[in-house]
Amino acid sequence: MKYVVMVSHGEFAPGLHSAVRMMTGNREDVLSTSLKEDMSADQFAENFAELVKDFTADDQVILLADILSGSPFTNALNVLSDKGLISNTLIIAGMNMPLAITAVLMKDNFDDLAALKEVLLSEG
């Protein structure tokens, strides 16, 4: 399966996920989590690991993050790397609504994540 996973500080990723859901419907291949004010980076990493626990080596991940090199971004990458999924992951920081909707609606039209990346970067 090809997943879109959104991560952020605060409620940005869950809020964006909610808005995307209004446009694309509720989908099991779109997930989100966030680093909340009262949460440590380690707690975020644990939550992210739980979110992606069923991902397999055959899965592909489109990781959308709010900020390049922020705690959600780096911890998500560490978890995906530990699971052996980093080579199957397209990573984009600076997520926004057009980018997220395009990722969800177009991801299954591309076998190659590099080709999808070109489309997504034109939206973001």
Locations of regions flagged by a protein language model:
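N-terminal loops that bind phosphate or other acidic moieties
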Residues: 1-124
